[in-house]
């Protein structure tokens, strides 16, 4: 699967966070003194994020290494001729990612935590209407469900050139991907569906993250070496005659 943003996608660059941070009395919280100016009002025309700095909460969390990213991809696609039947369907994906820089949080140099959550929406045009092998959009998946995606710990070493990652991983985030294909919708532009179609349950790819470990050595901005070991049956043993 290519992690792409189609033209119909709605990109949200922030999420609401309802922790009653101002009700706390910890001395570690930021406070204004009489000599400090009041915070300026958030302005959507100049802010880097859609919902501003959440009244100062976003930069406070950033000081502790915590950041959020929320993306909503929405597609309305259809089959007008041939295939199984004709019709149009909606499919979408809500992608929430939370990152924590452990160096900022607890002083763990080179450490990072990452969690991805998926909210899969709508119907699958490929299965229900077309009957094709390579999915019409790269967010298609059944059933519609909220589930955990990637969740891993990473340690950076060798002046940040070597990364060791362990946890729940998706192979289609690391292999056989072209950055220039990320603007396209059809999954043929991303991770090879022919490879996924020949693995039980589609293999360790979206939306089924599996236990694994990965090492990546960055030689420079253009060259890197990646090696990993992952569970190849993310949905359990196959019930086919091959009995994977």
Q: Which stretches of residues belong to each language-model region?
A:
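Surface-exposed coil loops of outer-membrane beta-barrel proteins
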Residues: 125-152, 160-244
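N-terminal regions that are enriched for targeting/export leaders
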Residues: 25-81
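Sec/Tat signal peptide C-region and signal peptidase I cleavage site
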Residues: 19-23
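Outer-membrane beta-barrel architecture
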Residues: 56-58, 97-99, 152-154, 214
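Bacterial N-terminal signal peptides
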Residues: 7-17
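Residues that define the transmembrane beta-barrel architecture of outer-membrane proteins
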Residues: 50-51, 64, 78, 88-94, ...
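Short loop/turn motifs that connect adjacent beta-strands in outer-membrane beta-barrel proteins
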Residues: 45, 52-68, 101-113, 158-161, ...
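Transmembrane beta-barrel strands of outer-membrane/channel proteins
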Residues: 68-76, 113-119, 164-170, 225-231
């Amino acid at each position: 699967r290519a992690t792409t943003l189609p033209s119909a996608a709605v990109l949200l660059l922030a999420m609401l966070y309802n922790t009653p941070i101002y009700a706390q009395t910890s001395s570690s919280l930021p406070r204004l003194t009489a000599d400090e100016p009041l915070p300026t009002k958030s302005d959507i025309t100049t802010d880097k994020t859609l919902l501003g700095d959440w009244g100062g909460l976003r930069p406070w969390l950033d000081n502790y290494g915590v950041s959020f990213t929320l993306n909503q991809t929405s597609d309305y696609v259809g089959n007008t001729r041939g295939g199984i039947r004709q019709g149009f369907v909606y499919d979408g994906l809500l992608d929430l990612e939370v990152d924590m820089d452990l160096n900022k949080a607890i002083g763990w140099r080179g450490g990072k935590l990452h969690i991805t959550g998926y909210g899969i929406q709508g119907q699958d045009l490929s299965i229900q209407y077309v009957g094709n092998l390579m999915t019409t959009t790269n967010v298609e998946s059944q059933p519609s469900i909220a589930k955990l995606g990637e969740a891993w710990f990473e340690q950076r070493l060798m002046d940040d050139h070597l990364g060791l990652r362990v946890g729940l991983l998706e192979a289609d985030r690391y292999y056989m991907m072209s950055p220039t294909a990320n603007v396209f919708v059809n999954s043929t532009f991303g991770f090879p569906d022919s490879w996924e179609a020949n693995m039980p349950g589609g293999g360790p790819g979206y939306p089924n993250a599996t236990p694994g470990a990965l090492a990546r050595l960055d030689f420079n901005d253009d060259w890197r070496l990646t090696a990993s070991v992952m569970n190849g049956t993310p949905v359990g043993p196959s019930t086919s005659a091959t009995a994977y």
